Amino acid sequence: MDIDPYKEFGATVELLSFLPSDFFPSVRDLLDTASALYREALESPEHCSPHHTALRQAILCWGDVTNLATWVGTNLDDPASRDLVVNYVNTNMGLKIRQLLWFHISCLTFGRETVLEYLVSFGVWIRTPPAYRPPNAPILSTLPETTVVRRRDRGRSPRRRTPSPRRRRSQSPRRRRSQSRESQC
C-alpha cells in the first residue's frame, strides 16, 4: 500500500522531502512545542481539527516506537545489534515522526495554506541552481507577513481614498465630460 499521511492536507511526502533532514527539530523539541502550544486541545476529548488528530496519532506512535526500541535494546545481548536497532529507529522512523510533527504543528501555528506555500517555495528554491537563486532559503515565519503585505498592497489605504484638492480639480472636468456624454445618450 502506498499511504501518504499528508495527502488529505494538500501536501505529499515528496513535497516534505525537499526539506533536508537537519531542518526538522528533534522529536523532543517538537513534542515540547506541541505540549506548550496545544496541550489542552490534544488532551481534550473533543475533536478540534484534523491536525490535532494527526498530532495525537504521531505522538502515540512515537511513544510506541520508543517503547519497542527500549524493549529491543534491553533484550538484545549483542551491543552491535542494539546499536543497529537504535540507529534505525532514530534515523528512519525518527525522521518520519519529526516531519509529521513539524508539519502539523506548523499548520496549526501558521495555517495550512502558509505551510503549503512555504513547502512549494522551498522546493522551487532548492531545485534552482545556486547561481540563479537568492542566497537565503524562504523562511516560514516570514510568509504570513509577506502574505499580509501583499493583501494590503491590493487594497487602498484610507489616505489614498481621500484625493488631494489638486486631484479633485483634475477629476472634475472628467466628471463633467462623462456626465455630458451620459446626457447625450
UniProtKB/Swiss-Prot annotation:
It comes from the Viruses. Keywords: Capsid protein, Cytoplasmic inwards viral transport, DNA-binding, Host cytoplasm, Host-virus interaction, Microtubular inwards viral transport, Phosphoprotein, Repeat, RNA-binding, T=4 icosahedral capsid protein, Viral penetration into host nucleus, Virion, Virus entry into host cell. This is Capsid protein. Self assembles to form an icosahedral capsid. Most capsids appear to be large particles with an icosahedral symmetry of T=4 and consist of 240 copies of capsid protein, though a fraction forms smaller T=3 particles consisting of 180 capsid proteins. Entering capsids are transported along microtubules to the nucleus. Phosphorylation of the capsid is thought to induce exposure of nuclear localization signal in the C-terminal portion of the capsid protein that allows binding to the nuclear pore complex via the importin (karyopherin-) alpha and beta. GO terms for molecular function: DNA binding; RNA binding; structural molecule activity. Residues 136-185 are annotated as: Disordered. It comes from Hepatitis B virus genotype A3 (isolate Cameroon/CMR983/1994) (HBV-A). Residues 179-185 are annotated as: RNA binding. Residues 157-179 are annotated as: 3 X 8 AA repeats of S-P-R-R-R-[PR]-S-Q. One of its GO terms (biological process) is microtubule-dependent intracellular transport of viral material towards nucleus. HAMAP family: HBV_HBEAG. It is found in: Virion; Host cytoplasm.
